[in-house]
């Protein structure tokens, strides 16, 4: 069970419709350190571990830029610059770049550690503790990567260039980029990384355009109202019927009929699409 102190600890969270990701400020997902880390689809964790190792060690965080749609993690690996750009589509899309900014050649071993356990959110919340930490699943080989499957769910993790272990010799100013995609089958990434990233970053501005806006002569109040509009979008999931507000983030990111009705009624003047959903 996650304590109140852990709930307000510094984690980075991204959400897009029914997917949300929780990680440390270096982008790593370590459920042994924070029980709720991982990629979630509704009330099921479809990826529990996601770590980057450079020459056998985890890089140290030196910078972070994150908004509602994407996050950029800046890391240092003994003088090598590591950048992780992450957003959500049908799962996680991530671009990992290792750059040699030194004046000498560097031998680099880039290794990606991944894992899945399909834990239930009820376990993370403490309602059913035995569901919080199921045994990890051994991956099987799949086209372009690996596959984890249990109880009707299957997660596929792919890498381009293929493989989760890469050895490179980088000269001064050279870099190496690896794309890692995590998707819940049968969905798979539908676009190249950059166009998909632009589309992800457009989700919240488009939502704001569809909502009623209020402007005042107080800049701080305007910023508060804009953030509140974005927060409502983050709460919402997409279903065949339309947008549906969930109860709360992160561990109540599931539909509750009463909560959704109350939220939709209050937001009728802002965006009636929620009530239709």
Report the location of each language-model feature.
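Terminal accessory carbohydrate-recognition/targeting modules of carbohydrate-active enzymes
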Residues: 1-229, 233, 239-243, 254, ...
């Amino acid at each position: 069970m996650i304590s109140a102190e852990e709930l307000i600890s510094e984690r980075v969270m991204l959400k897009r419709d029914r997917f949300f990701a929780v990680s440390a400020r270096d982008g790593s997902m370590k459920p042994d350190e924070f029980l709720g880390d991982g990629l979630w689809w509704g009330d099921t964790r479809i990826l529990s571990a996601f770590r980057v190792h450079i020459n056998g060690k985890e890089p140290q965080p030196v910078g972070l830029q994150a908004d509602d749609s994407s996050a950029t993690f800046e890391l240092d690996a003994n003088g090598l610059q590591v950048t992780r750009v992450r957003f959500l589509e049908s799962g996680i899309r991530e671009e990992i770049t290792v750059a040699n900014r030194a004046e000498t050649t560097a031998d680099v071993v880039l290794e990606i550690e991944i894992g899945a356990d399909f834990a239930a959110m009820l376990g993370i919340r403490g309602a059913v503790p035995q569901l919080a930490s199921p045994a990890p699943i051994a991956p099987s080989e799949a086209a372009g990567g690996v596959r984890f499957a249990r109880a009707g769910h299957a997660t596929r993790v792919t890498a381009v260039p293929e493989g989760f272990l890469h050895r490179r010799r980088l000269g001064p100013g050279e870099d190496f980029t690896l794309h890692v995609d995590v998707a819940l089958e049968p969905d798979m990434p539908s676009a190249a990384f950059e166009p998909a990233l632009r589309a992800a970053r457009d989700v919240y501005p488009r939502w704001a355009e569809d909502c009623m806006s209020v402007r005042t002569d107080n800049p701080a109040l305007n910023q508060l109202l804009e953030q509140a509009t974005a927060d409502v979008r983050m709460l919402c999931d997409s279903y065949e019927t339309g947008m549906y507000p969930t109860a709360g983030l992160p561990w109540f990111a599931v539909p509750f009929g009463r909560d959704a009705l109350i939220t939709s009624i209050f937001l009728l003047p802002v965006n009636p699409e929620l009530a239709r959903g």
